[in-house]
């Protein structure tokens, strides 16, 4: 399965995620949904935020030019929200899964889809 297949068939097909991308820890995008124009700089800031959440707390999470309010996170997961949209991201051994979800999808629904894929990638060494 290609990286694009993971985005299309695992994340978007769940209908719990409306936009998504998978990138390496260097910020290079491996696959992304159509119209989700997240930049390498935005991804780099997000990735550094997994280890140092202070930057996300003060500056929020910016994806595709949209700034989201940082809600919570760990060294593996980052959550953010803006109005009716939410962000759920997961860091694996070599990759970061970034997802956007929209109302009426609940945060737990998006989290379940993203983390299931993330856990699978970890078992595969990614």
UniProtKB/Swiss-Prot annotation:
Family matches, as CDD domains: PROF (cd00148)
Keywords associated with the record: Actin-binding, Cytoplasm, Cytoskeleton
UniProt-listed GO biological process terms: actin filament organization; actin filament polymerization; actomyosin contractile ring assembly; brain development; cell morphogenesis; dorsal closure; histoblast morphogenesis; larval central nervous system remodeling
UniProt-annotated location(s): Cytoplasm, Cytoskeleton
Cross-referenced PANTHER family: PROFILIN
Subunit structure: Occurs in many kinds of cells as a complex with monomeric actin in a 1:1 ratio.
The protein's role, per its UniProt record: Binds to actin and affects the structure of the cytoskeleton. At high concentrations, profilin prevents the polymerization of actin, whereas it enhances it at low concentrations. By binding to PIP2, it may inhibit the formation of IP3 and DG. This profilin is required for intercellular cytoplasm transport during Drosophila oogenesis. Function in neurons is essential for adult survival, and is important for climbing behavior and activity.
Protein name: Profilin
Organism: Drosophila melanogaster
Upper classification of the organism: Eukaryota, Metazoa, Ecdysozoa, Arthropoda, Hexapoda
Name of the coding gene: chic
């Amino acid at each position: 399965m290609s990286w694009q297949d993971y985005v299309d068939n695992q994340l978007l097909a769940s209908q719990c995620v409306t936009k998504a991308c998978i990138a390496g820890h260097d910020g290079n995008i491996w696959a992304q949904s159509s119209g989700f124009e997240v930049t390498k700089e935005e991804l780099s800031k997000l990735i550094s935020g997994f280890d140092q959440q202070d930057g996300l707390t003060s500056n929020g999470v910016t994806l595709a030019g949209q700034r989201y309010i940082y809600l919570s996170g760990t060294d593996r997961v980052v959550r953010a929200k803006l109005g009716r949209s939410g962000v759920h991201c997961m860091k694996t051994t070599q990759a970061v899964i970034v997802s956007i979800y929209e109302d009426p999808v609940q945060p737990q629904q998006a989290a379940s889809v993203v983390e299931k894929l993330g856990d699978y990638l970890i078992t595969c060494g990614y």
